């Protein structure tokens, strides 16, 4: 019975999570909200605290909301990861790590403390229990689909998760927000990384890592033949596919094609030099299927806005896999996620560690 089921909903202060909570109230669940703090002082009280956060101006959708300060964990597991990835010449995706280690971990821990049966978020994705497994699917609104960011979730998290917005488009969510009396109904969305002001990660790294100048120095910028065409200011400030800010004039557009931290060298080339047919991913997490033993056909995405592309997936030892695309992909980037799909279903994913042209 829904009336006897308590759902703890992650409340961010935005429209999506508020609507998710109101939908669950509307469906008859007992709903509690949890606002996870990640940018407060790590020394402040880490225990659950009552919050004055209101998700709706209508009395029937007023729910108790608690806050949980996970700033210390966020600094270690997300910000620390973000910095170290750039120092290792990889391009991180902090939102994926945050979903796994902060949002779902925090929700499930708080659910135990509050005796909640399930957890929910406002992500645009959906789940279904089929064949003895909880399966993860893309959201119906393909422009907003966030399944790419959820590939690290495992059965223990998904089996306790409800994703109410999975069948809705963003305009429908805003319309529901108005009908539910959600104050954030017209709130604009932020596309920035929450801890990087102005989305300027270069300036952030300079300010956040005191000894960055000692750990990273300028080096050579070379073309496809190895000829020095300029100098870079430090490899963490560059990413694969970058064209702007290279400081070299060759008479034609050039792009960062690879980063060599060992020799402190940035390699550049033409746009066609960015094309690759194959990647290797590590840390594979299989959601919709048992860890495969044989190659199989699927589609894969190599970045959030990427369209799923037909490929062949070959499992390897040590929880790795090779993904061979049927047509070349541009700017496959180490550190980003490769997420594997069958139609709309997320089969699994991993972190890109190597590419092959």
Curated annotation (Swiss-Prot):
Gene3D superfamilies: Adenine nucleotide alpha hydrolases-like domains, HUPs, Translation factors. ATP binds at residues 10-17, 36, 122. InterPro entries: MnmA-like, MnmA-like_C, MnmA-like_central, MnmA-like_central_sf, Rossmann-like_a/b/a_fold. CDD domains: MnmA_TRMU-like. It catalyses: S-sulfanyl-L-cysteinyl-[protein] + uridine(34) in tRNA + AH2 + ATP = 2-thiouridine(34) in tRNA + L-cysteinyl-[protein] + A + AMP + diphosphate + H(+). It is found in: Cytoplasm. One of its GO terms (cellular component) is cytoplasm. One of its GO terms (molecular function) is tRNA binding. Its EC number is 2.8.1.13. This is tRNA-specific 2-thiouridylase MnmA. It comes from Chlorobium phaeovibrioides (strain DSM 265 / 1930).
